[in-house]
Amino acid sequence: MSETHCLELFSTAPQSSATKDDDYMAQVAEVARWSEESGCRGILVYSDNSLVDPWLVSQIIVENTAALCPLVAVQPVYMHPYGVAKMVSSFGYLHGRRLYLNMVAGGFRNDLLELNDQTPHDKRYDRLVEYTLIIKQLLASSLPVTYVGEFYKIDKLRMAPRLRPDLLPGIFLSGSSQAGLQAAQKLAATAIQYPKPAGDLPPARDAGIRIGIIARSGEGEAWQVADQRFPEDHKGELMHKLAMSVSDSVWHKQLSQSAEEARSRRSIYWLRPFETYKTFCPYLVGSYRQVAEELSRYADLGYGTVILDIPPSREELQHIRRVVDLVTERVSA
């Protein structure tokens, strides 16, 4: 299936923490193939203290697809910027595959504390800007790079092997906080949000959303699937509240506030999966046309990149593809 002209679609790879060891490689390969078949540009690969290294997962993805681009979550606390640039250039040299980088300022607060990183929230974005600038300069320049900043210093550092210009990585960055939005602007990066309903969002430029989709021919059928996949779960709600209590993430708090506001009305925008600690993004639930209309509203506001939740099956991605095709038809009309 061809890509849409108004939406750039990414899926998400399974997490190793939720999969049996002997099944994980096969599951990553399978989800990657489904994603490519469904017209996705790339696939997000998570990174935190509990997960398999994202670069090794990206290797599995590249080996099992023809053009799907890994969107690798990158945290400064894990690797020097030279190491990230070297990984990107090596993937380009060995596979001729473009990567995308999802620049993460901190992730889970407890992960940072375990690594003795006590950098304040907004300061982590200052660090992330320096970190990303060094990566971009190393990959784009044919000359040695010197950089002196508050957090990093390099002196006449050259990247080899050289990366082809057409393989320079796309840069994504969480844009839910003011610090995140400012960092994205400085880096000319795509600001990704865990969004509120489209009607509650301001216009944006070169932005994206992280969202799940459950769509069927009829609204009732979609909600039946949604309730079966994400039933009420008191234990999950307690885990969510515990995670909230130790998080300094702005998007986490914003989504929790949206959940309080959404309880009083049933709408296409659904947060039970988030509230029961099953996922970290909101969902759109409804008929193909209802979900397409809401996605179109996001796209009209400038949120043209969509990062989907982990797909449970090939069939589910095919349902989502029908939604995206309706959005495309609307743009082409």
How does the language model describe each region?
Residues 1-67, 168-169:
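N-terminal beta1-alpha1-beta2 module of alpha/beta enzyme domains
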Residues 2, 33-37, 58-67, 88, ...:
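Acidic (Asp/Glu)-rich catalytic clusters
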Residues 2-3, 115-116, 121-163, 198-297:
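An alpha-helical appendage that flanks or caps ligand/catalytic pockets
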Residues 3-12, 43-45, 69-74, 99-103, ...:
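Hydrophobic faces of well-ordered beta-strands that scaffold small-molecule active sites
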Residues 6-26, 73-77, 81, 167-176, ...:
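Active-site mouth loops of central-metabolism enzymes
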Residues 27-47, 183-193, 297-304:
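Catalytic domains of carbohydrate-active enzymes, especially glycoside hydrolases
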Residues 43-54, 77-82, 193-200, 215-217, ...:
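Acidic-and-aromatic substrate-binding clefts and catalytic sites of carbohydrate-active enzymes
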Residues 54-72, 127, 131, 321-333:
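Alpha-helix-loop-beta-strand connector modules within alpha/beta enzyme cores
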